[in-house]
């Protein structure tokens, strides 16, 4: 279809399987967050009108830093990028079903509306600004919206005379 001018063409019923659609408006792009979650995620449920998602990842950071994610804690990325053009930007990563997560995988919960599908969708990973580490998959059904809020920062004690 290189250089084809399809202006006002009626393509309904056309079989384009095998056609090279790269750099056309018909090119298959990145999946929506919902599509990604349905294909690569572990599940979803509605909590307080939002879609809570279940995913998995490695317990220890594999590429940036040396973070080890502990069960029961909420983690918030110090920086988060919504850029969808590159696969490696600031954020916390979620692995798809086919993505290797090492010998100690963990289940995590995160909000679907905060998720970014980016870069090469074949990587089967996405990023989120925060997630909660679960002890087991069954914990997902008991989570509330408050469970995804980070713990308040400890305040310094006031000096007393």
List PLM regions with ranges.
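Tandem repeat scaffolds
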Residues: 1-46
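ADP-ribose/NAD+-binding catalytic cleft of ART/PARP-like enzymes
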Residues: 27-89
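ADP-ribosyltransferase catalytic core
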Residues: 80-139
């Amino acid at each position: 279809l290189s250089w084809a001018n399809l202006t006002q063409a009626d393509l309904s019923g056309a079989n384009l399987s095998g056609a090279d659609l790269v750099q056309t408006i018909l090119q298959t792009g990145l999946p929506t967050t919902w599509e990604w979650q349905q294909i690569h995620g572990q599940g979803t449920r509605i909590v307080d009108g939002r879609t809570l998602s279940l995913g998995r990842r490695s317990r220890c950071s594999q590429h940036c830093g040396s973070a080890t994610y502990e069960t029961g804690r909420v983690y918030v990325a110090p920086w988060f990028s919504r850029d969808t053009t590159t696969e490696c930007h600031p954020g916390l990563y979620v692995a798809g079903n086919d993505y290797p997560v090492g010998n100690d995988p963990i289940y995590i919960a995160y909000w679907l509306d905060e998720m970014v599908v980016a870069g090469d969708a074949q990587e089967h990973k996405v990023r989120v600004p925060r997630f909660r580490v679960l002890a087991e998959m069954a914990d997902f059904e008991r989570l509330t919206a408050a469970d995804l809020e980070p713990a308040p920062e400890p305040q310094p004690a006031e000096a007393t005379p």
